[in-house]
From Swiss-Prot:
This is Probable endonuclease 4. Its EC number is 3.1.21.2. Its cofactor is Zn(2+). Gene3D superfamilies: Divalent-metal-dependent TIM barrel enzymes. GO terms for biological process: base-excision repair. It comes from Thermoplasma acidophilum (strain ATCC 25905 / DSM 1728 / JCM 9062 / NBRC 15155 / AMRC-C165). Keywords: DNA damage, DNA repair, Endonuclease, Hydrolase, Metal-binding, Nuclease, Zinc. It is an enzyme of class 3 (hydrolase). The gene is nfo. Zn(2+) 3 binds at residues 184, 229, 231. The lineage of its organism: Archaea, Methanobacteriati, Thermoplasmatota, Thermoplasmata, Thermoplasmatales. Endonuclease IV plays a role in DNA repair. It cleaves phosphodiester bonds at apurinic or apyrimidinic (AP) sites, generating a 3'-hydroxyl group and a 5'-terminal sugar phosphate. PROSITE patterns: AP_NUCLEASE_F2_1, AP_NUCLEASE_F2_2, AP_NUCLEASE_F2_3, AP_NUCLEASE_F2_4.
Amino acid sequence: MIDEAIRSISKKYTIGGHISVAGGLHNGPARAAVFGFPTFQFFSKNQMRWSSPPLKDDEAAAFKSEVRKYGIESTMIHASYLINLASADPDLYKRSMEAFHDEIDRSDKLGSTFLTVHPGSNPDRADGIRRVRDALSTIGDHAVIILIENTAGQGNVIGTRLDEVAKIIDTSDKKLGVCIDTCHAWASGYDLRDSLEKFIESLDYTIGLDRIFAFHLNDAKREMGSRIDRHELIGKGTIDGGLINLIRDDRLRAKPKIMETPFGEARFEDNLRYMSSKIGE
């Protein structure tokens, strides 16, 4: 059993993690509650397959019941890694759109607060941004808040720079926002370690803090600007203390911060203990 003092860090700073739903979606909330998480992320289906069995009504009802039972304040579904809304390939774009719409439907059926999706890749960055914007314009009415995640800069991915992310969500749709991955931001050249305030100001200026709904809280294995997406345990990587300052920032405290660190649930307690030791609680 994890000490209540450690669990309290999760609640005070709105920290969660990516949780396995092996054995059924309804298992997620109980696993999140072990760490005192007020929020958590999960896959609603196999993230490496295009198709999946339809979500049954009783599965959705059981999940929502467990969310209420454990007092989970918000949930986040991570969309399939196969989706590429920026693709210029007609077949891939069509499959991506179908999968994206399915993710939205599943999110609404499960009552998920957020759905986070990677924008995708395209060697023509302007065309890629346009295609993602077009994709977002087709989704119609939905309850879930859709979040575009910034990327680390590998290959031809779109959304590496904050101004690209801002262009993608340049709309008045209040159910469209951004999830900032700290490892990705660091890998793409933003200094979260020694210039966090400058980074937060950049977020506010280019996107708006009101459009930043959540963070993926990850340290990084590689140096700033590496353009390599390799997550590390909190405090064991190259961002180090910058993440503690981000967690403690009053402007960001209430925003969900989801850990996607190596070994998942097996090391979440280590992450929380490190945070507690550095925060002094």
